[in-house]
Structure formats: C-alpha cells, structure tokens
Curated annotation (Swiss-Prot):
The keyword Flavoprotein applies. Its cofactor is FMNH2. Keywords: Amino-acid biosynthesis, Aromatic amino acid biosynthesis, FAD, Flavoprotein, FMN, Lyase, NADP. This is Chorismate synthase. Homotetramer. NADP(+) binds at residues 39, 45. Its EC number is 4.2.3.5. The gene is aroC. It comes from Streptococcus uberis (strain ATCC BAA-854 / 0140J). It is an enzyme of class 4 (lyase). One of its GO terms (cellular component) is cytosol. Reduced FMN (FMNH(2)). This reaction introduces a second double bond into the aromatic ring system. Belongs to the chorismate synthase family. The lineage of its organism: Bacteria, Bacillati, Bacillota, Bacilli, Lactobacillales.
Length: 388
C-alpha cells in the first residue's frame, strides 16, 4: 500500500491517490467524512474551521460500497479557495496581482525561509501553502481507509492528550483502554479528566488574547495487534522506526516515544523489561507494557503505546523578530490565519498516520488481493501465534 497527497492550503482541493487496498473492503465517503470532522473539532481551533466543512469525494477505486482493488482517488475541496483565486492562480498574472498576499517576512518555526532558500522562491507563500497543516486533512482521509481495514481484523486505534500546554493530565491507572477512548472522545480537549477542562480552556483563552500558542503531548494506543509485525533483520524493517518517522512527519511534531520512552533513561533494566507469561487461552503475553508493544522493532502482542510531542503553532498574532528577504532588514514575521492550539486535532492526525503505517505493514506481510484472502491469512497467523 502506498499513497501520495497533493494540494495547497488555499488551492482548489487536496487530492490523494491510494494504491494497494484489497478488493472487497466496505468503504463509503461517510466513514471518511466522520474522521475528517474529528480533525476539525477541538477547543482552540481558529476561524478557518468555520469556513471549511471537509467532505471527501471518492472518484475511483470504489464501486457499490466496496473497494475494487484499483487505485482509490480521494478529493477534498478547499472552500476557502474562492477568496484566493488570483493569489493561487495557475496561470501567470501581472506583477501587481502577483504581489497580493506575497510573503517576504518568514515566520520563525515554520518552513517559510528554509523552503524559500531550498527552492529559490521570491514569494515564500509557495513554501507555506504546501507545508501548511492543511495537508493533514488528506492524510486523515488515508487513515480513515486504513482504519476500516484494520477494524475488519480486530485492530482498533484511539488517542488522548496527556499534556496540554504544560498541564499534565491526571489519568487514573484503573481506566481501561475503552474507558480512555470514551472519555477522550467526549472531551473538546481530548483529555480523560473532565475536572481539568475548565482550567485548560481558561488557559487557552488567555493564550489567544496574548497572541500566543500552545503545544502538548498526545498518546495513540492501538489494540488487537498480533505478535510479529515488523522485523529486526534490517534497520529499515523495524516497525517502531517506521511509526516514529510517520509521527515525526506530522506538522509541528518534534518528538516521539514508545511505552515509557525517555523515562527509561532514569530506570534500571529490571524495572522496565516486560516479563513473559503464557496461558492456554491467550498463548504468550506480558505482565506489563513498559516497552509499548515492541521488542527489537517487532510487535510483541501487547497494545502499542506511542506518544508524540507537538510544538506550539509557529504562527503568532504577536509576531516574533524576522527579516525582510528583499531588503535583509529586520522586520516582524508575517501573520497568517492560525489557531492558539490544534492539539486535539493533531491527536486525530497522529491516530490516522499510525493506522496507515500499520495497514501498510499488514498488507506487506499477508496475502491480500481481496479482503476475504487477507482476513483468512491474518486469522490463520494469529491462531499460529497462540499455538507456538
């Protein structure tokens, strides 16, 4: 399974082509739209979320509610484009029109300047349009397809925010994964402790008034994953490494960890290794899950526990010091429409990119021209792991 996304933040649309999905997977635009709606939610989102109401058009690869095995094309219209037709025009325009909304004051923390230098732009809008987090809508659409496939195999994903703008969320250790999912989905902040909602929302409101932004930490949890996905035989076959790359590819993400991650640097080996147990019903399992479901880059049958840290959004309404790229004189950075925080939405994106990588790994490992073929191969394999 592979995919490509295309499109700019204020262009006509975002387009994605997915290749390698088996035939016979039940799929509808409604399922994808539900995931896109989740991405647009959350407390702290900005004005654009009132403009865009993302809906996908499936233009190939699905017929009568099921995938055909052919490439799937997904198109998401940018409703805001109608206000940007000259600015984002494909055809050449007079210089006066081309200077409209020209960006020459790069924003610290964004791809504006590095993109301009790398690709030789005189207008940094070319960089910011493609590097915008708007592109993640396309990846969420891909993830929605992947989640449909995983669900057919009994693999489920969820996410919650564990740190919001420096505020650590108090999470009761007794909560089951299903309870975590339910509580996080009910929260505008994607947190599981409702008693902290007011405190954090008040903080977000103040940050917005200050013209500043907030980041935080998101955890994605995946259940139902069998032993043996990924491989240790080559460095680039390790599944946790593939997932780390995927999480780090999300806009504004600056770190990733599995299980207890960086905290293990302060612990002894006897405290973090997950002891092995066996039962007639389940086969091999672990007494704990400090390692987050991976050993040697291979899944060990435990739930996958993955955390990603998102930096505060770099577009500030009280802009920082920058430089005019035409005069090289000091200037305040450009201001584009932005959010004080997009952490809950980033959690949805992370959940979906994780689902995409897992679907790719499963489709590589198992025979999968059709969903019937894949389901049988997957079930036969999981039965084998229990008998081993």
């Amino acid at each position: 399974m592979r995919y490509l996304t295309a499109g700019e933040s204020h262009g006509p649309s975002l387009t994605t082509i997915i290749e390698g999905i088996p035939s016979g997977l039940e799929l509808s635009s409604e399922v994808i739209n539900l995931e896109l709606k989740r991405r647009q939610g959350g407390y702290g989102r900005g004005a654009r979320m009132t403009i865009e109401n993302d809906k996908v058009s499936i233009t190939s690869g699905v017929r009568h509610g099921k995938t055909t095995g052919a490439p799937i094309t997904l198109i998401i219209e940018n409703k805001d484009h109608k206000k940007w037709t000259d600015i984002m025009a494909v055809e050449d325009l007079p210089d006066k029109l081309k200077r409209k909304r020209k960006v020459i004051h790069p924003r610290p923390g964004h791809a504006d300047l590095v993109g301009g230098i790398k690709y030789g732009y005189s207008d940094l809008r070319n960089a910011l349009e493609r590097s915008s987090a708007r592109e993640t809508a396309a990846r969420v659409a891909v993830g929605a397809v992947a989640k449909c496939l995983l669900s057919q195999l009994g693999i489920e994903t969820m996410h919650h925010v564990s740190v919001f703008g420096g505020v650590t969320i108090d999470i009761p250790e007794t909560l089951t994964y299903e309870e975590l999912r339910t509580k996080a989905q009910k929260s505008e902040l994607s947190i599981v402790n409702s008693e902290q909602e007011v405190e954090i929302k008040t903080y977000i409101d103040q940050i917005k008034k200050d013209g500043d932004t907030l980041g935080g930490v998101v955890q994605t949890i995946v259940t139902g994953v069998p032993v043996g996905l990924g491989s240790y035989v080559q460095w680039d076959k390790k599944l946790d490494a593939k997932l780390a790359q995927a999480v780090m590819s999300i806009n504004a993400f600056k770190g990733v960890e599995f299980g207890e991650g960086f905290a293990m640097g302060y612990q002894k080996g006897s405290e973090v290794m997950d002891e092995i147990i066996w039962s007639e019903e389940e086969g091999y399992s672990r007494k704990s899950n400090h390692l987050g479901g991976f050993e040697g880059g291979v899944t060990n049958g435990q739930p996958l526990l993955i955390k990603g840290v998102m930096k505060p959004i770099p577009t500030l309404y009280k802009p920082l010091q920058s430089v005019n790229i035409e005069t090289h004189q000091p200037y305040k950075a450009s201001v584009e429409r932005s959010d004080p925080t997009a952490l809950p939405a980033a959690g949805v994106v992370m959940e979906n990119v994780v689902a995409t990588v897992l679907a790719q790994e499963i489709l590589e490992k198992f025979s999968s021209d059709t969903m019937k073929e894949l389901t049988k191969a997957f079930q036969d394999y999981t039965n084998y792991t229990k008998r081993y």
